[in-house]
């Protein structure tokens, strides 16, 4: 019973396994991304994990859900790699993806996002070579680490009076390096990396 259910719906290159009227199953964002592909809007390829998987996660636990999803997610990532002519984790031609949460009903500002998944200490060097823009690559990596820390590890302020731990580190580096005005856009690559 568990193995036969479709849990991952792909989209990309003008094709989609889902469509707009599948909001209950794919969430609003997933259904809209599928529909945009079907009507020809240029949307990067991706995949949606169904809303039912959230219920399975609570009922069956993380390990069982990972087991149920692994093969389909690996196939979906391979499809993105093929369409984008890049490879997840590849140092020379890296594929970076975004992980965006969604729901059946719109909840602006309530759902978390992680951008630039796929960056690590080696891949950032490859992205630097590929783009010729080291500041872009390293800033993307910083943003990934910050979002991952926030969303996955819970490294974020508990209330509005708390200081964000990542922002505190950035401010400390900017102050130590004498960066004024204190804006991350004024940080040079050597400052970011030292």
What do the predicted segments below correspond to?
Residues 2-187, 194:
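Nucleotide/phosphate-binding sheet-loop regions of phosphoryl- and nucleotidyl-transfer enzymes
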